[in-house]
């Protein structure tokens, strides 16, 4: 990565990065401006449910954690825009250096992912209540719920709602998957507004895709994005009993 590349990296149009916390059945996002009792800044903020949004674009990446006795290993990757984008998976243990552990198309590396590293789908969404672009990450239980919902519904023709679903159990693990629902259909004015808003996302993702086409510099991959800190508390790792396999070809892109 050279001088121009460093100073001209694409900037995400998303203003808020949210994710589902299955262990508690909550949707949260990181707010760096929240002042904590100890005077420090930054905390997870819980979203009010049901949460309404419009889906504009989808991408995918690998992320997750592998807790250890003394340190935790974090897994993360670049953002893959197209199905054939090369995904570079990194690991970082404690304060140690980041290391590349896998690289290739998802179909070629999915069986080689270490325990704790999981596929995540990032939804670029428009939130009417805040009138802005945001990013919603679906992983684990929330990804499974989203895939099933998207198979049965026209997700690009209506606003979507997200709320706490019924408690589910896998082995000894109890968690709350989200429940997605269909809200009102887009009228002509809304369609025009969303099409205009989507242009900035498409432009950003084109830059990301172009970067993936040339090469993925490990220095360009976020190592500690605040919005993902603490995600190991989302829900316990579900036991690998063969029932959690996600058919990647069923993810709607």
For each predicted feature, which ranges?
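Intrinsic-disorder/low-complexity, polar/charged segments
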Residues: 94-95, 139-140, 187
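OB-fold ssDNA-binding interfaces and closely related basic DNA-contact patches used
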Residues: 1-130, 170-171
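A generic alpha-helix propensity feature with a strong bias for hydrophobic helices
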Residues: 53, 131, 180-181, 228, ...
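Polar/charged alpha-helical tracts
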Residues: 36-40, 100-111, 145-152, 188-211, ...
């Amino acid at each position: 990565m050279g001088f121009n590349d460093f100073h001209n990296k694409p900037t995400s149009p998303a203003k808020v990065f949210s994710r589902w916390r299955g262990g508690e059945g909550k949707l949260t996002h990181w707010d760096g401006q929240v002042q904590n009792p100890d005077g420090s800044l930054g905390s997870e903020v819980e979203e009010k449910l049901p949460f309404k949004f419009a889906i504009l674009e989808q991408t995918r990446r690998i992320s997750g954690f592998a807790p250890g006795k003394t340190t935790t290993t974090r897994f993360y990757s670049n953002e893959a825009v197209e199905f054939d984008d090369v995904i570079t998976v990194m690991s970082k243990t404690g304060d140690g250096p980041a290391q590349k552990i896998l690289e290739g198309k998802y179909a070629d590396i999915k069986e080689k992912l270490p325990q704790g590293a999981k596929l995540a789908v990032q939804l670029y969404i428009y939130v009417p209540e805040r009138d802005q672009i945001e990013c919603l990450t679906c992983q684990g239980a929330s990804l499974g719920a989203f895939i099933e919902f998207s198979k049965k519904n026209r997700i690009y023709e209506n606003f979507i709602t997200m709320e706490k679903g019924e408690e589910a159990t896998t082995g000894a693990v109890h968690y709350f998957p989200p429940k997605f629902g269909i809200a009102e259909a887009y009228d002509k004015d809304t369609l025009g507004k969303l099409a205009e808003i989507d242009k900035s996302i498409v432009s950003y993702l084109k830059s990301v895709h172009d970067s993936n086409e040339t090469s993925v510099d490990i220095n360009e991959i976020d190592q500690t994005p605040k919005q993902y800190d603490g995600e190991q508390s989302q829900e316990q790792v579900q036991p690998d009993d063969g029932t959690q396999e996600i058919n990647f070809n069923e993810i709607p892109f």
